[in-house]
Every structure is written in structure tokens, then in C-alpha cells.
């Protein structure tokens, strides 16, 4: 069976890219189609794959600020020629599900989420801390993007949701049924440890919608030790909010992460996420998880 993998953008490392890497291992001969690709910013494993990019990859500055080119992505994915395949498997949180499906080809969408800034523009812009005037400027475009997104969803043969929360959003925004398959999580290397530290832990990309500020402010006010592992464009703002008990350690090497997880007092997961891989790894390490009571975390964290 000839399979094409389709992914929104390969310019960052996170849970979506972990899912793509797992799909690539399942289908080792499948090329990866994506809008943009910055090999230096993602796992080296992708450099061994056949990654095919769209014309959008040549736009200036897009590797670091793809949000500026929001309207380019629907057209970028429509430009791919996927004839010659038996199956298209899209790993979607943005616009990649909008690829053209040739006659006779099946399209399965592994839906990380219906596109946030298409269906929840106000909330997305508030979480990302854009200029307050931007919603009014973008609102006329949202009607077009929502119609485009719905038409793209109509062309998909089968939807797979990563959590119950995403399944409900697929039904609400696309009017489609879906099955739930939780994302693959590497838990084999995470084990409980008899050595315990006295710190709380956050492991995340430091971007506004992850709401790491809630954990930073809570631990600062309560004078509790917190280690924040990860990096991103929100780091400077978070450091300005932090008290002396909050330590930012940057991106932690994968080899060091299991020990950091196993020794924490508890793992904090403050955002409204679609699923959440790091909390599952923390539980595999035998550590309790404190999560915001919404989103995908409700599938695996119980009070």
C-alpha cells in the first residue's frame, strides 16, 4: 500500500511532531508532505526521511513566524499532487487536511484538533497575546476560513480524534463522527525512582496558550519550588513573572528527562490541551499530576 503522510508544518518540536514520528515509523516508506520544513528545529530523525515542502517554504521568515502567513496555508496544501497513493494520512491541527484527494484514494485524518484560530479566534488571540484590535481585523476572514475548513473536512473519509474533547469538537465544527485513538506516548523509559526531590515540574514549549504563567504565578505566590523545563517565545515574559523559587532550565535533553520526571514532587499541567503527552510520562514515572480540569487531560487524570 502506497501511503502519503501529511503534516501541517515541520518547524518546531512538540507533541504533534512526536505523533508524526510515530506514524513515520509505522510507514517507513511514506514520504512526508508539509507546508514548511526547518530541519535544524526538529528531530534529526526527520532528516532521514523524504520530506516534501510546498511553495510556502520559500516565504521570508515563515520558519519562525508562520502565523503571519495564515492565509497562505490552505493554498499551499492544495498545491500538492498526491496521485499515485492508496492512502493519505493527515496529522492535522491546521490546514493539512485540505490536500486534494485524487479519485480512488482514501483519506484518514488523525485530528489533533480542529484549527483553533478558525473556530475559536477570540480565545486563541487572547491566549497568544496578540494586539487587542486584531480580532476585529481578522473576523471578516474567519467566515471564509471556516467555510474552507468545513469543505476540507467533508472530503475526508474517516476521522480519528486524539481525545474525547477533540471528538466533541469534530462533531461540533465538522458534523462528523470519529473514533478515539490516543496519541502514542513513549513510557518505556520512564520509571518510578526511590530518590525524590522537593520541586514541582512543568515540561512544555513556552508559548502563551500553554498557560505556564498559571503554574509560575501559583508557585511564586505560595513560595513553592518549581522547575520549568522547555523553551519558547514566552520565556522572557514568564521569567519576569517568576519569583526566586522558580527555575527555568531550558530544553532538557531526552536522556535527562526521565530522572527529572521521577524525582519531582508533582507534575503541573496548567493548560487546556487537546491531549498532553508529558503528563502521561509523569504518571509512568509514578508521579501525581495536577492538571487544569478541561480538555484532553480528563481522559486520563481523575480527582
Where are these regions (language model features)?
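Nucleotide-activated donor-binding/catalytic signature segment of Leloir-type glycosyltransferases, i.e.
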Residues: 236-258
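Acidic donor-binding loop of glycosyltransferase active sites
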Residues: 262-274, 287-288
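Short glycine/serine-rich donor-binding loops of glycosyltransferases
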Residues: 276-280, 297
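Acidic anion/phosphate-binding donor-loop and adjacent secondary structure
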Residues: 168, 172-173, 184-198
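Active-site donor-binding segments of glycosyltransferases and PAPS-dependent sulfotransferases
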Residues: 26-97
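Short hydrophobic beta-strand element within catalytic cores of glycosyltransferases
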Residues: 288-291, 301
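Conserved donor-binding/catalytic core segment of Leloir-type glycosyltransferases
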Residues: 191-227
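Membrane-proximal helix-turn-helix segments that form the acceptor-binding/catalytic region
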Residues: 127-159, 167-168
Amino acid at each position: 500500500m502506497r501511503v502519503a503522510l501529511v503534516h501541517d508544518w515541520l518547524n518546531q518540536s512538540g507533541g504533534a511532531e512526536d505523533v508524526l514520528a510515530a506514524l513515520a515509523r509505522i510507514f517507513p516508506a511514506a514520504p512526508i508532505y508539509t507546508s514548511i520544513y526547518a530541519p535544524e528545529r526538529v528531530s534529526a530523525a526527520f532528516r532521514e526521511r523524504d520530506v516534501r515542502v510546498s511553495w510556502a517554504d520559500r516565504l521570508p521568515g515563515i520558519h519562525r513566524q508562520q502565523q503571519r502567513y495564515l492565509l497562505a496555508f490552505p493554498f499551499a496544501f492544495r498545491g500538492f499532487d498526491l496521485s499515485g497513493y492508496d492512502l493519505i494520512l493527515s496529522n492535522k491541527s491546521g490546514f493539512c487536511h485540505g490536500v486534494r484527494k485524487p479519485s480512488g484514494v482514501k483519506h484518514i485524518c488523525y485530528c489533533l484538533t480542529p484549527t483553533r484560530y478558525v473556530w475559536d479566534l477570540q480565545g486563541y488571540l487572547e491566549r497568544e497575546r496578540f494586539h487587542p484590535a486584531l480580532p476585529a481585523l481578522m473576523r471578516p476572514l474567519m467566515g471564509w476560513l471556516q467555510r474552507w475548513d468545513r469543505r476540507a473536512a467533508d472530503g475526508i473519509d474517516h476521522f480519528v480524534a486524539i481525545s474525547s474533547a477533540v471528538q466533541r469538537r469534530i462533531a461540533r465544527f465538522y458534523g462528523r463522527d470519529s473514533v478515539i485513538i490516543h496519541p502514542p506516548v513513549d513510557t518505556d523509559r520512564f520509571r518510578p525512582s526511590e530518590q525524590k526531590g522537593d520541586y514541582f515540574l512543568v515540561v512544555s514549549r513556552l508559548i502563551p496558550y500553554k498557560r505556564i504563567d498559571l503554574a509560575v504565578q501559583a508557585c511564586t505566590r505560595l513560595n513553592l519550588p518549581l522547575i520549568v523545563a522547555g523553551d519558547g517565545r514566552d520565556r522572557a515574559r514568564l521569567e519576569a513573572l517568576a519569583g526566586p523559587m522558580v527555575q527555568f532550565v531550558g530544553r532538557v535533553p531526552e536522556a535527562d528527562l526521565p530522572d527529572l520526571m521521577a524525582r519531582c514532587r508533582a507534575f503541573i499541567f496548567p493548560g487546556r490541551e487537546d491531549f498532553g503527552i508529558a503528563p502521561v510520562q509523569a504518571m509512568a514515572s509514578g508521579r501525581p499530576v495536577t492538571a487544569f480540569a478541561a480538555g484532553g487531560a480528563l481522559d486520563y487524570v481523575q480527582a
